[in-house]
Amino acid sequence: MHHHVKKSYINSQFGQVHYQIYGEGIPLILCHQSPSSLDMFNSAYPVLASLGIQSIGIDTPGYGQSDGPNSQPKILDYAQCVVDVITSIGYDKVSLLGHHTGACIVAEIASFRPGLINKIILNGPPLLTQDEKQKMLQMIEKAPSLTLKKDGSHLLKLWNKRIKFTPGWTNLDAMHNGIIQMLRADKNDIFGFKAAFDQDLESVLMRIESPTMILTNTADDIYFAALRTKELRPDFIFKELQDGTHDIVDEQPTQWSKCIADFLK
């Protein structure tokens, strides 16, 4: 079945923000992890559409085909851009899903614009201690920066870097697409991580009053943080898929989409 896809841009504080609308049905905003783009949900868009969900994928400023900030933004800045997309399309109320950094953005929106929201899905919320944030940031900052080489060896370096950050990976398409998104994000690909680590996610989570589901998978690199979120907010629905990595959408698109549809309906 062919589903209608509409791609568009809106103006934001950082320039133009790119988004796409896929299918018809219950509107669901999708916010991606870092460094990625709305393409991280490509395997799920048709499945969600077949389940009666209209997906609105958004490229966070600085990623995918959105213009980027020149200096370090906060999660609140990214969140405001997502709200701008929602209001510009004209939705009264939407549900939102965010994966990793996207979960930070979605939680932020739920805490400062609750009137816009039907339901929230936190996919792998990065509820980390200061120590864990510090270690992860050091790992990310220590990774060699991209210097172009005539023999193309810089591309292999990037490939190996993503493999190192994806233990237990199985999906070649997801790995390839991940590399494309890293190349697109270029020198500022760290902005999303830094914004996420700067946010006080715990206090933001405590302010959420919308119906919320934590969605995770048991071999996600921050699975433990989802369990921690469940402890913090036992009132949130908790759903976990088996195995998988941070490429779970490519690895298990049908199971992933069904969890979402069950919750939204």
Q: Where are the predicted features?
A:
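N-terminal cap/lid segment of alpha/beta-hydrolase-fold proteins
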Residues: 1-16
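Conserved HGGG/HGGXW glycine-rich cap/lid loop of the alpha/beta-hydrolase fold
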Residues: 14-65
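Conserved loop-alpha-helix segment in the C-terminal half of the alpha/beta-hydrolase fold
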Residues: 48, 212-250
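Active-site loop/oxyanion-hole signature of alpha/beta-hydrolase fold enzymes
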Residues: 50, 57-97, 101, 258
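Flexible "cap/lid" loop of the alpha/beta hydrolase fold
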Residues: 107-112, 118-149
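Conserved alpha/beta-hydrolase catalytic His-Asp/Glu region
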Residues: 131-132, 149-206
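Serine-hydrolase catalytic core
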Residues: 196-209, 218, 227-230
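Post-His helix in hydrolase/transferase enzymes
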Residues: 249-262
